[in-house]
Amino acid sequence: MKKDIHPEYVECTVTCACGNTFTSKSNKSEIRVDICSECHPFFTGSEKIVDSAGRVDKFKKKYNMK
């Protein structure tokens, strides 16, 4: 590898929206994620409802669509 051309590989803190944190390695010192293994439905066995219909309704209302 050539010297001084690669980004520094440091230990980083990964923070999930659910509040779970863990450490990993990355070029950044801090990473924020929306979902992790502690809150993902596949790992928890529970179902999580995503409110995508609300976004569509908001868009239609904003642009006066029917």
Curated annotation (Swiss-Prot):
Cofactor, free-text remark: Binds 1 zinc ion per subunit.
Pfam families on file: Ribosomal_L31 (PF01197)
Binding residues for Zn(2+): 16, 18, 36, 39
Gene3D superfamilies linked to this entry: Ribosomal protein L31 (4.10.830.30)
GO cellular component: ribonucleoprotein complex; ribosome
This protein's UniProt keywords: Metal-binding, Ribonucleoprotein, Ribosomal protein, RNA-binding, rRNA-binding, Zinc
Recorded GO MF terms: metal ion binding; rRNA binding; structural constituent of ribosome
GO biological process: translation
InterPro entries for the chain: Ribosomal_bL28/bL31-like_sf, Ribosomal_bL31, Ribosomal_bL31_A, Ribosomal_bL31_sf
Cofactor(s) required for function per UniProt: Zn(2+)
Superkingdom assignment: Bacteria
Protein family: Belongs to the bacterial ribosomal protein bL31 family. Type A subfamily.
Subunit record text: Part of the 50S ribosomal subunit.
Classification via HAMAP family: Ribosomal_bL31_1
Role: Binds the 23S rRNA.
PANTHER family (UniProt xref): 50S RIBOSOMAL PROTEIN L31, CHLOROPLASTIC, LARGE RIBOSOMAL SUBUNIT PROTEIN BL31C
This protein's name: Large ribosomal subunit protein bL31
Species whose genome carries this gene: Campylobacter fetus subsp. fetus (strain 82-40)
Organism phylogeny: Bacteria, Pseudomonadati, Campylobacterota, Epsilonproteobacteria, Campylobacterales
Gene assigned in the entry: rpmE
